[in-house]
Amino acid sequence: MMIPIYIEEKKYMVEDTKNVLEVCLSLGFNVPYFCWHPALGSIGSCRQCAVKLYDNLHCVPDSKHINFGRLVMSCMTPVIKDMYISLFDKELQEFRKNILELLMVNHPHDCPVCEEGGNCHLQDMAVMVEHTYRRYRFTKRTHYNQYLGPFITHEMNRCITCYRCVRYYKDYAGGNDLGVFGVHDNIYFGRVQDGILQSEFSGNLVEICPTGVFTDKTQSKNYARKWDITFAPSICHQCSVGCNIILGERYGKLCRVENRYNSKVNGYFLCDRGRFGCNYIHIKNRPQKLLKKQNNCGYIEINAVDAVQDCVNILKSSNKIIGIGSTRASIESNFALRNLVGADNFYSGMSFFEQERLSLIFEILRNSGIYIPSVCDIENYDAILILGEDVTQTSARIALAIRQAVRSKSDHMAKYVGIYKWQSLAVTNFAQDAKYPLFITGIDKTKLDDIAMYTYYDSVQNQARFGFSIAYAVDNQVSFVKDFNLNGLDITKLDLVVEKLMCARKPLIVSGSNSGSKELIIAAVNIAYALKRKKSDVGLVLVDHDVNSIGLSMMTSKSVDDVFNTLSDTNNGNAVFNTVIILENDLYRHASVAKINKMLSNINYLIVLDHQYNIIQDKADLIFPVSSFAESDGTVINYEGRAQRFFKLYNPQNYDKNSDILESWKWLYLIHDTYVNCTRVKAVNIDYIIDSIACCFPELKKIKYASPKSNFRVHGQKLAQSTHRYSGRTSINANVNVHETSTPINDNTMFTFSMEGNSGNYSKKCSYNQIPFVWAPGWNSPQAWNKFQDQIGGNLYPSDPGVLLFDTGQENKCIDDNLYKSINWLKFASNSLNISKYTNKWIVAPYWHLFGSEETSQNVECIKNCMLNPYAMLNILDAKYINIQENMYIKFTCMDQVLCLPVKFSMDLPKKHIGLPMGFPGIPVFFSGMYVSNIEMMEAP
């Protein structure tokens, strides 16, 4: 309900559930604070956010009634109808200044050497309250700084005891290895002893901390102050969630990765893989030059004109041209390859089974009518079932949202007794450890088990059987698989799951492709369909593996196995010339060595475009070095069908005139235009490609609304990617040439690679939401996001970036069966899901890891430091049966590939399964669900 309040004698209508601090910030007032955070709520520990509250309107703050008001902490004070607040009272200003001086008693005077300088909330607040002189002249407290791992630097002496770090790490993220120790003015925030922080979300401490206690260790190698950095809005490419990030560069080196607020996706937080896993763009063995194979005896460098012409000559001499796309390449790059080779010759590059699962997920997104919630929507569900997907390792930001959904029961319980959600300590004390039900099925333990009501560990086949059982129990008219063998399943637990899902106001079903089972996906949809028939406001989340898995699935349904079959059929004794073009894809992750070698024997030319080195490049005839996501523009589509744009941070040619690196789509269009003798008046830009995509794929026509076009201007200006305080622009290249270089030109987007442009995006009348850097007058730190939102924690102005491509039935809460006539494909579910009875073979169970399973981030040095060594996981009973002890080595064969790995034991992994860390070097992702044979013990290599 909206109520009137008065701030500085002016009337405002505000929500009655908010606190005074939140209301003031939403209205654009500058109120200093430290301990409060929009995602964490209020505890009132810093005393910095004081305001003056008057009893009534007649007690205005003038000389006559100067003592009528009282100081209150705005973060702990709920708004009340007709309350009168002063923000600029003299007594109040003096109080704030004194509080900040007390907080600074033990804070070192090290701003010039602190890496938080220029991006520091403490600096902002000191300026805001006009604290300039410190009277404390005695010894300062000193602390021991801990080693917290390769991601975060610890400098405890800068702490002002706001308690934000432990409230986030323990209460919000569910970590248990960071705590608070000591009493009085000797408080310590850290671990019991030195060691790597175990939470997958520890990197958010860097932005949560208002001072420099926790800083980004990975930034130190290429450090630059915030005002000297060029920024660009981008999308994290490390999983299918598509979190919004801000990239920063100086001297052509990535020096900063920050969270970019989006109320529909990642909110205020990122996972550690997304925050720290981007530096692969500077890996030393990255392709940098155009290379051509010379008579099978090595490569020579060639120029761009010759490379394009050589490629065209190859294509013109070929009878068959095949293009293999990539789930880590943008929609535009994949389309450019498809445009070059033709729709019939364009393949996804995924294995047959992975392509089958993704095509199924795409069909569900397009036709099911079941609502697919965003990451932040997930936090509003009150019963969750996870089928076979270890989301902490495959889509960590979803796991963090699930934690908030489970713990939100406390908020709802407190609401009924008049306790507001932002009163975090009161909510915790009242509700204690109340949780909404979470049920998990999997092959082994997960990091979410600590908050689960029930966990079920078994093979993916039995997990699917369990899922179909739930669907049938919810509504026996819905499930197409009715004859279930429930041996080994706890019927009472099945009844518990069904009861909680049916009683829930908003149940959520989570599954995905990473389990390696299409039956699990079908079971998840059956459950969601059954619940929706019962008039439930159900949600369905189906996780994919890569950032653009859905986007590529919308363009083709042909897998890399179809490539092998096509080439085998094409050759078949005939003298034909075959050419394969591979776009940003390591085929050895998706197909066996034998199949790839056979493909190579059936082709005459291999052309590779990539920004990462992989073994397939050693077989290539031409290698085109292409831009990484930080050096290019493009669109990707996340798991919910949300199209999001990422923007070029810098042009490699700006720092190296001899660089051959171009965007994939730019190389492919150069080749295409030369191949078809097309002369363009104007070079192809990304707007042209997006318009072409919209014409070819009606389901992708909305991607043009994911971002303004390149001709977008604000007051006739492009948007600046650097702050107006950017220094040294004219001297960056002075060591190479004393003559000042011209400002780089960006023709593809509405941004400019400089400070010269519009940077007034902090205005709430702003007409764009693609924010290159977060800054507002007086707000230099990430806390400045409050200046870009319609209300605290709300949408960005004018709306959040990105556009949903599918109408997933959010409003269809009461449906009839006619809506589902288009999803008869659910009927292909197998009536019997039998476990293999082979006694001499083992099924590969996929173990995914946040650090190591993703193709590109595993090349980053700090990620390598957190990766486990490759291993083989066995059930402890199986190990005893074959007389294997832990840490011994076993040798086995999978898909004609011989592996030798140390053994680990699990109590929960199903029998006759061998768990392998998917995606690790030497363990391709297509191993999931395959058979292992010839296990034998051996000495450690």
From Swiss-Prot:
Record-linked InterPro entries: 2Fe-2S_ferredoxin-like_sf, 2Fe-2S_ferredoxin-type, Mopterin_OxRdtase, Mopterin_OxRdtase_4Fe-4S_dom, NADH_UbQ_OxRdtase_75kDa_su_CS, NADH_UbQ_OxRdtase_ferredoxin, NADH_UbQ_OxRdtase_Gsu, NADH_UbQ_OxRdtase_Gsu_4Fe4S-bd
User: Which cofactor(s) does the record list?
Assistant: [2Fe-2S] cluster; [4Fe-4S] cluster
Which positions, given as ranges, span the membrane? Answer: none
Q: Which UniProt keywords apply?
A: 2Fe-2S, 4Fe-4S, Iron, Iron-sulfur, Metal-binding, NAD, Quinone, Translocase, Ubiquinone
Positions of [4Fe-4S] cluster 1 binding: 107, 111, 114, 120
The UniProt record lists the 2Fe-2S ferredoxin-type domain at 1-91
Cofactor notes = Binds 1 [2Fe-2S] cluster per subunit.
Which positions bind [4Fe-4S] cluster 2?
159, 162, 165, 209
Q: Which parts of the sequence bind [2Fe-2S] cluster?
A: 35, 46, 49, 75
UniProt entry tagged with the keyword Isomerase:
no
SUPFAM superfamilies in the record = 2Fe-2S ferredoxin-like, 4Fe-4S ferredoxins, Formate dehydrogenase/DMSO reductase, domains 1-3
* Residues annotated as binding [4Fe-4S] cluster 3: 236, 239, 243, 271
Q: What is the recorded function of this protein according to its Swiss-Prot or TrEMBL entry?
A: NDH-1 shuttles electrons from NADH, via FMN and iron-sulfur (Fe-S) centers, to quinones in the respiratory chain. The immediate electron acceptor for the enzyme in this species is believed to be ubiquinone. Couples the redox reaction to proton translocation (for every two electrons transferred, four hydrogen ions are translocated across the cytoplasmic membrane), and thus conserves the redox energy in a proton gradient.
| Family, similarity comment | Belongs to the complex I 75 kDa subunit family.
Tell me the PANTHER family matching this sequence: NADH-QUINONE OXIDOREDUCTASE SUBUNIT G (PTHR43105:SF10), RESPIRATORY NITRATE REDUCTASE (PTHR43105)
This chain's protein is named NADH-quinone oxidoreductase subunit G
| Name of the coding gene | nuoG
